A protein has these predicted regions:
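Glycine-rich, anion-gripping cofactor-binding loops and their flanking helix/strand elements
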Residues: 230-310, 318, 433-460, 482-485, ...
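Conformationally flexible catalytic loops at phosphate/diphosphate-handling active centers
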Residues: 158-163, 167-222
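Glycine-rich, acidic loop regions that bind phosphate or pyrophosphate groups
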Residues: 101-139, 152-164, 253-366, 513-514, ...
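A short, small-residue-rich loop immediately preceding and capping a beta-strand
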Residues: 21-24, 45-47, 65-104, 282-289, ...
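Active-site diphosphate/adenylate-binding microenvironment
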Residues: 8-16, 29-30, 34-35, 39, ...
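N-terminal cofactor/phosphate-binding cores enriched in small/glycine residues
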Residues: 2-88
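Phosphate/pyrophosphate-binding active-site segments
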Residues: 1-2, 137, 301-397, 412-422, ...
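Thiamine diphosphate
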Residues: 100, 107-120, 429-461, 467-576
């Protein structure tokens, strides 16, 4: 029988799953549920040591003898601090200790309660990873992995333990700290079996990307509904050459921030009331790149609870965006996909008919969505402005200049920076044929215009006779005025920076938040309503400016803005 504490059972299950075999345990009441569970697990041998200072070094000796990570479990308070000498020594010897400390509930820290101190980070200088598990006590009576989707807390707990144990079992043998806050009562041992928890594995094939994990290949080949998803990825670092088999047989969803020459209009496919959602739900997901803009796509993929999800990551960090991550392959995305393509191609004749039909269904729905967008009447609106700009840019782009050549270091002749919120979401509908840049790492309001200006400065031609590339920035009013000092510099007059300013007098993104419209604070206090224009800013900074107040002016203004025969900064302000 095991403890009734869900966090303790998740921890115990994952310790066993990650192959931990040795645990040094110290006496105490707060850590008793953890010690009890460790003792109940046949794969784990427990060694009782009373003095925590000695226990840490005892665990170090086991790690030296076995070359395996070793748990050392202590109660709350200064018991944790007594491990510092041993942990420091283990750190410099590259011996992995998994420090598991019980803790009091967060609300009782620094409240003069017994055996309480700030435990998270107490051993941070010698720890590769420190995590504090969430309080799962509200779920004590009914937790199981089958019901974990009802609350984000079990997923969070599972992910944190996986993160720590992935590091602890790494070839570099670091130390990690797992802090476990526990509420009373502590001594209820009535759970018959440990939960079968999701295990996340990390694979680092170093430079030999041909040695991909077999499980990844097996999951892909056996999938009936395989899906590849691309997030933000620099076009300078990915050219999708040598990946023809994968991309020709597996459906790929991507936004404007991915290094492709068009976008997938999946937002229009994944509408809440779509009758296709259940048949489109993938059973295999390969996630490449960084941030994804679409909330709808993220929600859709989080609903695929049983999907075998793999992530290609340059850093190796556990980024469980869809809450169903199983495997993490560390390295260069293009090289890994090329290796996967090579291993996948012999199995194409044996691809499941379900997988073939799944791709065909997606392609048809995406084609219908694109046709619907293209047939929508053009209006004087934010959407109309972006649509007209992208149409005009298409006429400026040749097949030879639409993306970076992987075999040269030439600067691209045209790039478009989209600010966050409404602007980048419109790019996901209409951008095509050119790289799209956006500060999506943190998704902040600040810096979009400054980033575009810096980009324009970096690609400025050193020869007056050679025209510099056109660099566009599509930006909303709040983001523009917030970052207006991007235009306050001496190099600006030389930049071919072209700004499409969508000025609707407030943050339009707030209009789409359900329920916010009922608040009296919405227009002025939340959405930042204003009556400001860019006229004065353009005058003082030497930026040519035109204004569009109707569709005809907008059409003429876009032609003026995208005129490649002229030089210098220009701004088209669309007054909506």
């Amino acid at each position: 029988m095991f403890s009734n504490k869900p966090s303790v059972n998740i921890l115990t299950s994952l310790l066993v799953a990650h192959g931990v075999k040795h645990a040094v345990v110290c006496p105490g009441s707060r850590n008793a549920p953890i010690v009890h569970n460790l003792n109940e697990c046949p794969p784990i041998t427990c060694y009782p040591i009373t003095d925590e200072r000695s226990a840490g070094f005892f665990a170090l000796g086991i790690a030296q003898a076995t070359d395996e990570p070793v748990v050392v479990c202590v109660t709350s308070g200064t018991a944790l601090l007594n491990l510092a000498p041993a942990v420091a020594e283990a750190h410099y010897q590259h011996q992995s200790l998994i420090v598991v400390s019980a803790d009091r509930p967060a609300e009782w820290i620094d409240q003069l309660d017994g055996q309480t101190l700030q435990q998270p980070g107490a051993l941070a200088p010698w720890m590769k990873k420190t995590v504090t598990l969430p309080d799962l006590s509200p779920l004590t009576s009914h937790y199981s992995p089958l019901t974990s989707h009802l609350s984000p807390l079990p997923w969070h707990c599972n992910r944190l333990v996986n993160e720590a144990l992935i590091e602890a079992t790494d070839d570099t043998h670091p130390c990690v700290h797992i802090n476990v806050p526990l509420n009373e009562p502590l001594f209820d041992f009535t759970v018959e079996t440990l939960p079968e928890e999701r295990v996340i594995r990390r694979y680092a094939p170093a430079t030999d990307y041909s040695c991909l994990p077999q499980q990844l290949l097996d999951d892909l080949q056996s999938a009936k509904r395989p899906l590849i998803v691309f997030g933000q990825l620099s076009p300078r670092r990915f050219h999708y050459e040598g990946i023809d088999h994968l991309f020709s047989h597996i459906i790929v969803l991507h936004e404007a921030l991915a290094p492709f020459t068009s976008v997938s209009p999946f937002e229009e496919v994944l509408t809440p009331h779509s009758s296709h959602l259940s048949s489109l739900t993938p059973d295999f997901i390969l996630y490449v790149g960084d941030a994804i803009v679409s909330k709808r796509l993220k929600h859709f993929l989080r609903e695929a609870e049983d999907a075998h999800t793999w992530r290609i990551s340059l850093t190796g960090e556990v980024e469980d965006t869809f809450q169903n991550l199983r495997g993490l392959v560390v390295g260069d995305a293009e090289a890994i996909l090329q290796a996967l393509d090579s291993k996948f191609s012999p199995h194409i004749p044996h691809l499941s008919p379900h997988a073939v039909n799944y791709r065909r269904q997606w392609l048809q729905l995406l084609s219908d969505a694109r046709q619907q967008l293209d047939n929508t009447p053009l209006t004087f609106s934010e959407e109309g402005a972006v649509r007209l700009l992208e149409q005009q840019l298409s006429s400026l782009i040749s097949p030879h200049t639409s993306h970076l050549s992987p075999h040269s270091s030439h600067l691209i002749p045209l790039s478009v920076h989209y600010a966050n919120s409404t602007a980048i979401r419109l790019a996901n509908r209409y951008a095509k044929g050119h790289p799209v840049w956006c500060n999506r790492g943190t998704n902040g309001i600040e810096g979009s215009l400054s980033t575009a200006a810096g980009f324009a400065a970096a690609v400025l031609s050193p020869h007056p006779s050679h025209p510099s590339p056109l660099i566009f920035c599509v930006i909303g009013d709040l983001s523009f005025f917030y970052d207006q000092n991007a235009l306050w510099n001496t190099i600006l007059p030389r930049l071919n920076l072209r700004i499409l300013l969508l000025n609707n007098g407030h943050g339009a993104i707030f209009d789409h938040l359900q329920g916010l419209g009922q608040s009296a604070a919405h227009p002025a206090l939340v959405a930042g309503a204003h009556h400001t224009t860019a006229e004065g800013i353009c005058q003082q900074c030497g930026v040519s400016r035109q204004v569009a107040t109707d569709l005809e002016q907008l059409q003429k203004g876009i032609l003026w803005l995208a005129d490649a025969e002229t030089r210098g900064p220009r701004l088209l302000e669309v007054m909506l």
